[in-house]
From Swiss-Prot:
Its EC number is 7.1.2.2. One of its GO terms (cellular component) is proton-transporting ATP synthase complex. It comes from the Bacteria. The record marks S362 as: Required for activity. Keywords: ATP synthesis, ATP-binding, Cell membrane, CF(1), Hydrogen ion transport, Ion transport, Membrane, Nucleotide-binding, Translocase, Transport. Its main location: membrane. This is ATP synthase subunit alpha.
């Protein structure tokens, strides 16, 4: 048989042309140090800041420190199986988390993995945890109210959709309760809620999740949890993961409420990571960029322009103070970033005034423009009245004789404090808030004994529900008060029927 050299050479040539090498070229390095959620690696010459890196055992890390000799890496998850000398590879990607509708009703960790035992989350959408905030021209001013269902907040420090309102106070003053009640009040309000629990006990998070489930709020809520037992990198990442999930909905034109509970623990986790990465410590041993840590997070909350869908992210960050010191480093940082703060006082809480909102130290810088007309009318002088009452109350401790006008102010003040109290997990619709505050500010409660105010309010709301639902409907639909004569007549009718005269 004759050998055809041309045929063979053509065949070989074809084989060479069709050959596809079955390998990929990736830059690798070697782990030189491991411990406390931190690794150092040598050899990753072209790695990017924030890039995702893959360890030999399948764990992932994120490049944080880019130095001339090595790279400082925070490890996402368990680091006990990683050893010095292990290989580490670049992925060329930055960290992303799963996003979308399928996360609603689920409890996930900061990497988007389910921790509620309800199976896998099926979504093919992801978003980067670090993303630029909307620019100046991409934003709209805050104009729509976000009703918390709490009289003290909706009347004194109103919050608008797209606002950042800090909730600040000592531990055990009711910060989480305010957030949970606000989430409960978003039912049927076309609002998606994200609750980010940072550095809390797992039993506490479980309790919050059960509360949300019990009241049907888990149907529109995502819970992101990085518990106290988890490594610092996950506590540091949790808020960014939460806001990435929120951005997906915002850019679809939806409205989102996100709660960060709390950013003090995130700052402590970041301080721990920074010290382990040998970054220079500053005030209170925090690194120099701790302000940027929170500003780049909170600036991502906004009400975006109509061209981008007109959606919004409203942020309620928490800061825990020590002995009521709101001039501490992290507290003043976050106060300067946010659009106002709600200060919860230890003394008020212990005196049974709950929610323990200190009206004098609390402010909402942009929420007033989002408050509905009816609430503006009834609550306009409430803050000043409350402040003057506190002043007079302190003055009366000296036992001075009081004139009739001062005594009347004190009586009104005591009733105001009682009306603004509210039981937990019982948010009140805004139309009911308006009616009781109208009755208060127009003197209808001046003859009601202070001890009977709570019972008075319960019966008052029941009466309006049964006898005058049209008044509540008018306030709900028009966002304004009905004719004063109509309201006065209805309240007088209630007083004539009741035993409070």
């Amino acid at each position: 048989m004759a050998i055809n050299a041309q045929e063979i050479s053509a065949l070989i040539k074809q084989q060479i042309e069709n050959f596809k090498p079955n390998f990929d070229v990736t830059e690798t390095g070697v782990v030189t140090y491991i411990g406390d959620g931190i690794a150092r690696a040598h050899g990753l010459e072209n790695v990017m800041s924030g890039e995702l890196l893959n360890f030999e055992n399948g764990s992932y890390g994120m490049a944080q420190n880019l130095e001339s000799t090595d790279v400082g890496i925070i490890i996402l998850g368990d680091f006990t199986d990683i050893r010095e000398g292990d290989t580490i590879r670049r992925t060329g990607k930055i960290m992303e988390v799963p996003v979308g509708e399928s996360l609603i009703g689920r409890v996930v960790d900061p990497l988007g993995r389910p921790v509620d035992g309800l199976g896998e989350i099926h979504t093919d959408k992801t978003r980067p945890v670090e993303a630029p905030a909307p620019g100046v021209m991409q934003r709209k001013s805050v104009s729509e109210p976000l009703q918390t269902g709490l009289k003290a907040i909706d009347a004194l420090v109103p919050i608008g959709r797209g606002q950042r309102e800090l909730i600040i106070g000592d531990r055990q003053t009711g910060k989480t309760t305010i957030a949970i009640d606000t989430i409960l009040n978003q039912k049927d309000q076309d609002m998606i809620c994200i609750y980010v629990a940072i550095g809390q006990k797992e039993s506490t998070v479980r309790t919050q999740v059960e509360t949300l489930r019990q009241y049907g709020a888990l149907d529109y809520t995502i819970v992101v949890t990085a518990s106290a037992s988890q490594p610092s990198p996950l506590l540091f990442l949790a808020p960014y993961a939460g806001v990435a999930m929120a951005e997906e909905f915002m850019y679809q034109g939806k409205h989102v409420l996100i709660v960060y509970d709390d950013l003090s623990k995130q700052a402590v986790a970041y301080r721990e990571l920074s010290l382990l990465l040998r970054r220079p410590p500053g005030r209170e041993a925090f690194p120099g960029d701790v302000f940027y840590l929170h500003s780049r997070l909170l600036e991502r909350s906004a009400k975006v322009s109509d061209e981008l869908g007109g959606g919004s992210i409203t942020a309620l960050p928490f800061i825990e103070t020590q002995a009521g010191d709101i001039s501490a480093y992290i507290a003043t940082n976050v106060i300067s970033i946010t659009d106002g703060q709600i200060f919860l006082g230890d003394g008020l809480f212990n005196a049974g005034i709950r929610p323990a909102i200190d009206a004098g130290s609390s402010v909402s810088r942009v929420g007033g423009s989002a408050q509905i007309k009816a609430m503006k009318k009834v609550a306009g002088t409430l803050r000043i009245d409350l402040a003057s009452y506190r002043e007079l109350e302190a003055f009366t401790k000296f036992g001075s004789d009081l004139d009739a006008a001062t005594q009347a102010k004190l009586n009104r003040g005591r009733r105001t404090v009682e009306v603004l109290k509210q039981p937990v997990h019982k948010p009140l619709p805004v139309e009911k808030q308006v009616t009781i505050l109208y009755a208060l500010t127009h003197g209808f409660l001046d003859t009601v004994p202070v001890d009977d105010i709570v019972r008075f309010e319960e019966e008052f709301h029941a009466f309006f529900d049964a006898q005058h639902p049209e008044i509540l409907e008018t306030i709900r639909d028009t966002k304004d008060l009905p004719e004063e004569a109509v309201l006065d007549a209805a309240i007088t009718e209630f007083l004539n029927q009741s035993s409070f005269q």
